[in-house]
From Swiss-Prot:
It holds the Pfam family Tymo_45kd_70kd. Residues 274-284 have a biased composition (Low complexity). Residues 55-80 have a biased composition (Polar residues). This is Uncharacterized 48 kDa protein. Residues 249-266 have a biased composition (Basic and acidic residues). Belongs to the tymoviridae protein p69 family. Residues 49-81, 162-295 are annotated as: Disordered. The lineage of its organism: Viruses, Riboviria, Orthornavirae, Kitrinoviricota, Alsuviricetes. InterPro entries: 45/70kDa_tymovirus.
């Protein structure tokens, strides 16, 4: 048995009908190498079958066109075996013929048309409107089963071309670290208004070169005729010992206003011109200046108010009232802003101390004499009466000397006292109280 075909005549051979099973035939010949490739005519004579013109394997051709066996058949064999072999070969070839016919059916060669020979459609010849920048074709109209249909090329006439710059951004053969200060394109001349002229294009920022800050210069003089130019009082400024215990700012403001009105009514003089006599110990009062000269007068700001050459101001620490003047008991005379012309008044202070000591000693002696007078009878009464009269004489003598020691209320310069020393007005008041409390 070669290639699956039996050659022994003794084995029964089954007759295959023309309805040969394609599956069985394919199983028999699938193991062999290329089967019949050549064409076999469809019509074949009944008795004979032409040899297969195949280009396949040589053993397959010999088996299909096999010669009769070497040993002759016995005379007892049926003569019908020979035609059965032929029928088998024809039936086998028929099955193969039908199979090869299906597999090797030549395709009808369709003449392919070149793209230039395609029928022109009216939609392709339409011009693209200038308002549209998209291509004229639409993908939704094309059919997916027509591979021979190509997309229409867009019309490049309506595509804008960018102008090439005259100069590149970076020059060739140049270091990248160096900045390129050259412009990409040449500057165009633009008509711009003059920025120096007032125009809407002019910037509103101030020019620092034209505007310069003025130098700060101190004021050397002030107009005294202006009521608003009232100098700051010296008492407001804290001295070496701190701010002085004076009345509140409202009272001082009212005092300054009243003083300014008085000075204005008297042509900027501290006192009326009737009192031309000067008190002892004070500088002479300058002569009155005319009104026209006082209006044009200019006084430097840094002039001290206690300077004797200043005609319009006097020391702030001097009071017209002696009671208020006695309350100034802080610091030395020089530290309180007093004028050096008031320093000779220290002799008056020493006299006040002597009077105070004598008054205290006399008061003690008179108290002892009064106790002795109460122990005695008539003699004690007369002695107490005489002692009381003697005490009254001393008080009257002190009261007579009091106005001489203390300055009058109308005087300009009233003395100030150091801390720890009694003032002259207080001493006089104490003497009056002692005289009033003594039994008559």
């Amino acid at each position: 048995m070669a290639n699956g075909f039996s050659t022994s005549p003794r084995r029964p051979i089954l007759h295959h009908s023309p309805r040969f099973n394609l599956g069985s035939s394919s199983r028999l010949f699938c193991e062999s190498t290329p089967i019949f490739i050549g064409t076999i005519p469809l019509h074949c004579p009944k008795g004979t079958c032409p040899p297969a013109q195949s280009h396949g394997h040589s053993s397959l051709r010999t088996n299909l066109n096999s010669s009769p066996p070497r040993c002759p058949q016995n005379p007892g064999t049926e003569p019908s075996l020979q035609p059965l072999g032929k029928v088998l070969q024809c039936g086998l070839s028929r099955g193969l013929h039908e199979t090869l016919k299906v597999l090797q059916t030549p395709r009808e060669e369709l003449p392919l048309q070149i793209s230039s020979q395609l029928p022109t459609s009216p939609s392709r010849l339409q011009s693209v409107p200038t308002s549209q920048h998209k291509p004229a074709y639409r993908e939704a109209i094309l059919h997916p089963r027509l591979p021979d249909v190509f997309y229409a090329a867009p019309n490049l006439r309506f595509v804008r071309k960018l102008p090439k710059p005259s100069q590149s951004v970076r020059q060739p053969r140049r270091s990248s670290r160096k900045l390129n200060d050259r412009l990409v394109s040449k500057p165009r001349s633009v008509s711009v208004l003059n920025p120096q002229v007032d125009s809407p294009l002019h910037t509103r920022r101030a020019l620092s070169r034209q505007l310069q800050s003025a130098r700060q210069r101190p004021r050397l003089a002030e107009n005294l005729c202006d009521p608003n130019s009232i100098p700051e009082p010296v008492r407001v400024r804290p001295g070496i010992l701190g701010p002085s215990p004076f009345p509140s700012y409202r009272e001082e403001l009212s005092n300054t206003k009243s003083r300014f009105s008085e000075d204005k009514g008297s042509d900027f003089l501290p006192n009326p011109p009737s009192s031309n006599s000067s008190e002892p110990g004070l500088p002479g009062r300058p002569s009155q200046a005319p009104s026209c000269a006082s209006e044009n007068l200019r006084r430097p700001l840094h002039l001290h108010s206690s300077n004797p050459n200043s005609p319009h101001f006097r020391s702030r620490w001097i009071r017209k009232n002696s009671v208020k003047q006695a309350r100034v008991q802080l610091g030395h005379i020089s530290s309180l802003g007093q004028s050096p012309n008031l320093r000779p008044l220290d002799s008056l202070l020493q006299a006040s101390r002597v009077l105070h000591a004598t008054s205290v000693s006399s008061y003690k002696t008179q108290g002892a004499s009064h106790e002795e007078c109460f122990k005695t009878r008539s003699d004690g009464i007369t002695s107490s009466h005489s002692g009381h009269l003697h005490h009254n004489d001393r008080v009257e003598h002190q009261l007579q000397q009091g106005p001489l020691l203390q300055c009058s209320q109308d005087s300009l310069a009233e003395p100030t006292y150091r801390p720890g020393t009694p003032s002259l007005p207080n001493f006089c008041i104490a003497a009056k109280e002692l005289s009033s409390t003594q039994p008559s």
